[in-house]
Amino acid sequence: AREETLIIIPGLPLSLGATDTMNDVAIVKEGWLHKRGEYIKTWRPRYFLLKNDGTFIGYKERPQDVDQRESPLNNFSVAQCQLMKTERPRPNTFIIRCLQWTTVIERTFHVETPEEREEWATAIQTVADGLKRQEEETMDFRSGSPSDNSGAEEMEVSLAKPKHRVTMNEFEYLKLLGKGTFGKVILVKEKATGRYYAMKILKKEVIVAKDEVAHTLTENRVLQNSRHPFLTALKYSFQTHDRLCFVMEYANGGELFFHLSRERVFSEDRARFYGAEIVSALDYLHSEKNVVYRDLKLENLMLDKDGHIKITDFGLCKEGIKDGATMKTFCGTPEYLAPEVLEDNDYGRAVDWWGLGVVMYEMMCGRLPFYNQDHEKLFELILMEEIRFPRTLGPEAKSLLSGLLKKDPTQRLGGGSEDAKEIMQHRFFANIVWQDVYEKKLSPPFKPQVTSETDTRYFDEEFTAQMITITPPDQDDSMECVDSERRPHFPQFSYSASGTA
């Protein structure tokens, strides 16, 4: 059966549901839904409340009083999402799909009857319309119109407009870094500067299905306005007639995974340096952007030419095999999953501190805290097994890792309202001056042996050995940037981090 798109709306990121900060937040609809697990793809009954602020929260049991409402298992927002109806993998299914940063995230639900599904769809649409009106009333004044031939969005004052429209022809395509359901990530070289970037290419149809028109690309704006020394910056974003393209920094000091593999284990001091930079970046995402990163793992950490951390945003939603009996029960990187993610208790910021615990354990112990080739056994270890440490590890490091790898997110270090501040105050980081971390005043413990931003010695040899072709043979699918009147869905999707290339 075809998916049917109902609505696309701007608003909050999916990752952090809005909370009851005002007394006039009302419940619009409540009832039982079956929610499909995000990783272990079984269906679980959940009692959901939809509120007029966009909050969509689920419980194992129907909450009887206000106290019980304070700790939902699932907590996210229906804002800025597509809502789709489908009859697969079960009848009366609906899917909420959202672009968080540049990664497409989905949640899947089903109900017993078409009428029930229609009721939920109508309720969600009602909430969406209210949020849309609110946003329109409070939205910053923007000059320029969708038909503006420059194709450039009015930027915040701090950002210069691009002097020319960026197109796909300005890059050499070197290596496929990742592929998934919604698109691909390619290592590219900008012809004019010789600099390397990661280009994430998303198929437009998965973000705007059928003839729905996107009100705005809020997440694109979030990315543009994110400025943090240890987060991958967005250099350009542009579109072709069927794709959205995000061009992001690709740090050339090599993946941390590469350096750790070579050295097997890092000293506690070196791990402390990298850990501090990661904490600084996650603190910014949580407190300034209200975003949970969700995907912290060694492969997503790179070093820049000076040896500072860069957290990447090259993630793609992994593809399942098939619906039905042959469907793999799991997709993603299982070794890094927090217990609450495995149990499908939709997670908050504490999931990032679990991820920090796993990567810092790898750095200081030279192996993963939990590992088994058999996924079922691995899940059991993550959920049940106590953490073990090598005898050589110092007491402060043990204390930090024990706190970060607590199974219960509410008991986890950083799991309380203080979030990152709790980790910053831990005795393992006692000598760290956090403002100095942010300002890159700490000297990196290892400096990559690269001479410039175009030095490729830490790249896989095959990265630079040959160019890859990404233009499909079909003329209709040309990768040329097309005129604004031919792309009504994303009339203002164009961005450059500076006026020059």
Curated annotation (Swiss-Prot):
SUPFAM superfamilies: PH domain-like, Protein kinase-like (PK-like). PROSITE patterns: AGC_KINASE_CTER, PH_DOMAIN, PROTEIN_KINASE_ATP, PROTEIN_KINASE_DOM, PROTEIN_KINASE_ST. Residues 171-429 form the Protein kinase domain. It holds the Pfam family Pkinase. The keyword ATP-binding applies. The modification Phosphotyrosine is found at Y347. Its EC number is 2.7.11.1. ATP binds at L177, G178, K179, G180, T181, F182, G183, K184, V185, K200. GO terms for molecular function: ATP binding; protein serine kinase activity; protein serine/threonine kinase activity. It catalyses: L-seryl-[protein] + ATP = O-phospho-L-seryl-[protein] + ADP + H(+); L-threonyl-[protein] + ATP = O-phospho-L-threonyl-[protein] + ADP + H(+). The AGC-kinase C-terminal mediates interaction with THEM4. Belongs to the protein kinase superfamily. AGC Ser/Thr protein kinase family. RAC subfamily. Interacts with mouse THEM4. This protein is synthesized as a Gag-Akt polyprotein. This is AKT kinase-transforming protein. It comes from AKT8 murine leukemia virus.
